[in-house]
Amino acid sequence: MVKKAHSFRRKTRGKLSKHPRRRGLPPLTRFLQEFEVGQKVHIVIEPSYHKGMPDPRFHGRTGTVVGKRGDAYIVQITDGGKVKTFFIHPVHLRPQKG
């Protein structure tokens, strides 16, 4: 029997893959995004940049910006009945519209 892998990126072939035309790093404006405290943001993982990447199970979730630490933003998400706090690089965040 082979041991089961429990790595960070397991079972993410579809979630963390890019189409060939979208390969490489995103534009610099995505790295330099600014968010306000209290602003709602969506977690959309950028697979080509690994720093400040949240766990893939939170891809697509919406949270609230609570503060900033270094280049990363402190984002709170409700998971079930629990409030969880993440330090996420802005390249993995998109502002909520509307």
From Swiss-Prot:
Pfam families, sorted: Ribosomal_L21e
Metal-binding keyword on record: no
GO cellular component: a single term: cytosolic large ribosomal subunit
Region Disordered, annotated ranges: 1-27
Tree of life domain: Archaea
Compositionally biased region (Basic residues): 1-24
GO biological process: translation
InterPro entries recorded: Ribosomal_eL21 (IPR001147), Ribosomal_eL21_arc (IPR022856), Ribosomal_eL21_CS (IPR018259), Ribosomal_eL21_sf (IPR036948), Translation_prot_SH3-like_sf (IPR008991)
GO MF terms, alphabetically ordered: structural constituent of ribosome
Family of this protein: Belongs to the eukaryotic ribosomal protein eL21 family.
Quaternary data: Part of the 50S ribosomal subunit.
Protein name as it appears in the record: Large ribosomal subunit protein eL21
